[in-house]
Amino acid sequence: MPRKGPVAKRDVLPDPIHNSKLVTKLINKIMIDGKRGTAQKILYNAFDLVQERSGRDAMEVFEEAINNIMPVLEVKARRVGGSNYQVPVEVRAERRTTLGLRWLVNYSRLRGEKTMEERLANEILDAANNTGGAVKKREDTHKMAEANKAFAHYRW
């Protein structure tokens, strides 16, 4: 925690091709070692594959996929009287998009296809169809929150 008060939240600039801040955030999640050009190339090639395979606009499919991945509820550990409870809490809008993008990239990296472009494209298509690793992660998160609904009164 900085001594001079809270740190100002920096806003991302929209990407040059789709003019979308969400796409810029995804590029930042894909980027490794500051190689933005490589990350952009991967994403735009993946979008081309998505458009080719789905026959729809890649941005529409991507937004649908992200909406299917973003969690509404999650659990947070809360210590009460010597024992830890998994307390279900609602996820703030900013964190929802962050988690959605993070899960999309992480589960893309775990896939078996040869190139990252193919992995990302297939994960986006799967997420748009409510299947795939990232959507399963969201379902598991919601299941955990549902299972621990009894501890909801410990919310803070």
Swiss-Prot record:
GO cellular component, one term: small ribosomal subunit
InterPro entries: Ribosomal_uS7 (IPR000235), Ribosomal_uS7_bac/org-type (IPR005717), Ribosomal_uS7_CS (IPR020606), Ribosomal_uS7_dom (IPR023798), Ribosomal_uS7_dom_sf (IPR036823)
GO molecular function annotation: rRNA binding; structural constituent of ribosome; tRNA binding
CDD domains: uS7_Bacteria (cd14869)
Keywords: Ribonucleoprotein, Ribosomal protein, RNA-binding, rRNA-binding, tRNA-binding
GO biological process: translation
PROSITE patterns membership: RIBOSOMAL_S7
Keyword tRNA-binding recorded: yes
Superkingdom, taxonomy of origin: Bacteria
NCBIfam families reported in the protein's UniProt record: rpsG_bact
HAMAP family: Ribosomal_uS7_B
Protein family membership: Belongs to the universal ribosomal protein uS7 family.
Subunit structure as annotated in this protein's UniProt entry: Part of the 30S ribosomal subunit. Contacts proteins S9 and S11.
Protein task: One of the primary rRNA binding proteins, it binds directly to 16S rRNA where it nucleates assembly of the head domain of the 30S subunit. Is located at the subunit interface close to the decoding center, probably blocks exit of the E-site tRNA.
Name this polypeptide is given: Small ribosomal subunit protein uS7
Lineage: Bacteria, Bacillati, Bacillota, Bacilli, Bacillales
